[in-house]
Amino acid sequence: MDNFFLGLSCQEENNFWDLIVADISGDRSVSVPIRSAFRSYMKDTELRMMSPKISSSKVNVKKRMVNLLRKNWEEKKNTVAPEKERSRRHMLKERTRREKQKQSYLALHSLLPFATKNDKNSIVEKAVDEIAKLQRLKKELVRRIKVIEEKSAKDGHDEMSETKVRVNLKEPLSGLDSMLEALHYLKSMGTKLKTVHANFSPQEFSATMTIETQIRGEEVEKRVERRLQETEWKLLFLPEASFYKDY
């Protein structure tokens, strides 16, 4: 809208200067007789020769004055236009910033309790309270987890029981890889290996192991057999993924 009015203003100014120049050029000029009690002595020929020069000189001076005024006016106009454009851009940026800030406050308000007021001060104060409350809860949870882990480690050390685990795998791709993977998995479960008796053949892989563990023997067997099936799948589709080179 500002650009529209600025364009109309420029057009009106140009028309104004054109009218002034047209008046000066003699299209619609009004001559004013010079009244004086004295009259200079000149011949008729000299008067006819000098009158066009005098008239032309007056017109040139007036044109120069008009051009000078127009130049000064355009310079002022050119300095005012960028300032208006800068103010307009600043206003748009400020409006965008306030809109983003409003959306941020609304998003934060949606995460707070239902009874929270929707003014900025209430939102910020309630958010600070909620953050402090969450930090206290976090510290309490960390403390409880630490206590449970310490108790679990102590109870586990006292309740370790010895049991036998038997695993069986039909037509293994690599009995050695299967055995190594079973031992590695038992170690990751926190068990202690006592004895191992294994049988390798192209038709079957079987192993009987005596271990100390907190978990029931049946559960250990299921987990180890499931892990061996995953190992067979890896060896079948990824032949280069042999576990033998990792030990």
Curated annotation (Swiss-Prot):
Record's keyword terms, sorted: DNA-binding, Nucleus, Transcription, Transcription regulation
GO terms, biological process: regulation of DNA-templated transcription
Location relative to the cell: Nucleus
Major localization listed first in the record, in broad terms: nucleus
Chain ranges of the bHLH domain: 85-134
GO molecular function: DNA-binding transcription factor activity; protein dimerization activity; transcription cis-regulatory region binding
Disulfide bonds, paired cysteine numbers: none
Domain of life: Eukaryota
Stretch forming the signal peptide: none
This protein's GO CC annotations: nucleus
Complex formation: Homodimer.
Protein name, entry field: Transcription factor bHLH92
Gene that this polypeptide is encoded by: BHLH92
